[in-house]
Amino acid sequence: KRVVGIGSPRASLEPNFLLKHWLGPTNFSSGLSDPEASAIEKLTKILSSTTANVPSVRQMESADAILILGEDVSNTAPRIALALRQAVRNESFSMAEAAGIPKWQDAAVRNLGQDELSPLVVVTSSESRLDDVASHIYCLNPDEIADFGFSLAEKLNGGEIEDEMVCTAADILLQANRPLVVSGISGSHPDILSSAAMVADTLSMSNKDTMLSLCVPESNSMGAALLRDQNTLSLTEVIEQLDKIDTLVILENDLSRRLGKNALQKLADSKVDIISLDVLENDTLNLSSMVLPAASFAESEGTLINFEGRAQRYFPVFEPANERLPSWQWLVKLASLGSDEKLSGLDCFDDVVSLLASSDEKWSEIDKVAPGQAFRDRGQKIPRQTHRYSGRTAMNASVSVHEPP
């Protein structure tokens, strides 16, 4: 019988990889919708080839001129939006430094700066929550946003462009010491990414401190895209092959957000058994024959590929409640029910990471992202709580109370 797995950009690398390793590439889908997968693939190629710097969130705060091209950053990347709010204050910090006021003297810095902000040019198709700190706001449709970006790149390269908006943005970026270009895939227009990359690359020819940041929609969108190859299935192909599939294993993915109404109805009408692993209630669980409760990010360990293309590890701070288990453990248990031994011998998280590192050259350094379970700090494990944790004995008083006689 054929079992097909659908991964998720919400889940970490490890369970996505285990699902692919267990069922094989020809029976695995990354869980990205077709337009989303195409856009993120293009985004990863841009990040790997751009001559501009790809900044961290902290580095974005140092920008002294910012261009947002076709991305509602407050919705897709709120932490980056906060960094941009910090960045526009750099003008007041420069004024304070010239006046001899230390940066930590916040009240004095704000009083001196008043409404003086570093330039922020927002070019989007709707209002955004950054409009209140923007110096220039241009509301255009997606086609016009892409054309704006290409015209701006041409102007930065010395071309003759008469458009006043383009000339204004070009002057702002050329006068900056650390310009930042921000874009992403939420505009659902393939040329917006290309135009943003062209602006950053053109600007970097004259300014090596130029930065380019491209936002992705979910925590591990980049990781899910990197697990795709020429043998893996798209979501469309999975739906087309439903009559040849006996069981679907869906990993932390709400397909109602990624499939059209007709495709979702076809899945509901099929005789496929669906096993879902998830921590959140969603419409996909209503279609499932079995639901396995997965641990949340705060109760499990995993690796994400962030918007920079950098691997980041997260660690559990709580024990999974009730019957919940990390997704990778559920997959190991499911695999052990059959005769397939591909996931046998995976006793701890480090074993999964080691298997991932040995599977492909691009993952060869993944086991160096963070220390393994054998790591000790002066002979002790890293505690989840401080030694003097207030209310420790009262946390579970509703379940059990231990008092001296």
PLM feature spans:
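Non-catalytic alpha/beta scaffold blocks inside enzyme catalytic domains
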Residues: 32-366
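A glycine- and small-aliphatic-rich helix-loop capping segment at beta-alpha/alpha-beta transitions
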Residues: 22-25, 85
